[in-house]
Amino acid sequence: MWVPPEDKDPILLMAPTRKSVALFGAVSLRDGKLVTHFEKKFNAMTFRDFLTILLRHRRRMRKIVILLDNAKYHHAVMLRPFLKNHRDRLAMEFLPAYSPELNPIERVWKLTRKLCTHNTYFEKLETLIDAVATEHKIWNVPNETLRKLCCII
């Protein structure tokens, strides 16, 4: 197909920005249910807020084991009292350094990029957040897609 030279490589103008959003997430390996939480930034306080949300989603008499990378805020001193209070319901296991391929949630982030953000221009950060949140609402219930994607053999 012939395309005029001036239309061959269209230039998409976009305003430079340093805006960002933090997204915490966890997948139940038992049933594939996804729990996510948007924040303005990653730090110990926002991580503690996410852990509180995660504890609300846990099944009775079940302990939650979370696989984590070694981000600084995962080891924060201010988390110790919270973790001590919830040690019967919450356990944290740290993955080896520089090994994101071992973290099941990384597969979910890759699928999210593929399905709703890949090769897409979002004029506003809010539009991006809405697109990701809409996709994640589908996965807020037990589902086979995420269960199979995140299964550990």
For the regions a language model picked out, list residue spans one by one.
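RNase H-like polynucleotidyl transferase catalytic core
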Residues: 5-16, 84-104, 121
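Extended, low-complexity cationic-aromatic segments
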Residues: 1-53, 149-151
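RNase H-like two-metal-ion nuclease catalytic core shared by retroviral integrases
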Residues: 20, 68-70, 77, 93-115, ...
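Short, glycine/charged-enriched secondary-structure capping and boundary segments
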Residues: 1-3, 79-83, 107-108
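Residue-level signal for pocket-adjacent positions within structured domains
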Residues: 29, 33, 97, 144
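C-terminal anion-handling pockets and recognition modules
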Residues: 105-153
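RNase H-like DDE/DDD metal-dependent nuclease/strand-transfer catalytic core used by mobile genetic elements
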Residues: 46-92
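Short beta->alpha junction loops/turns
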Residues: 40-43, 71-72, 98, 121
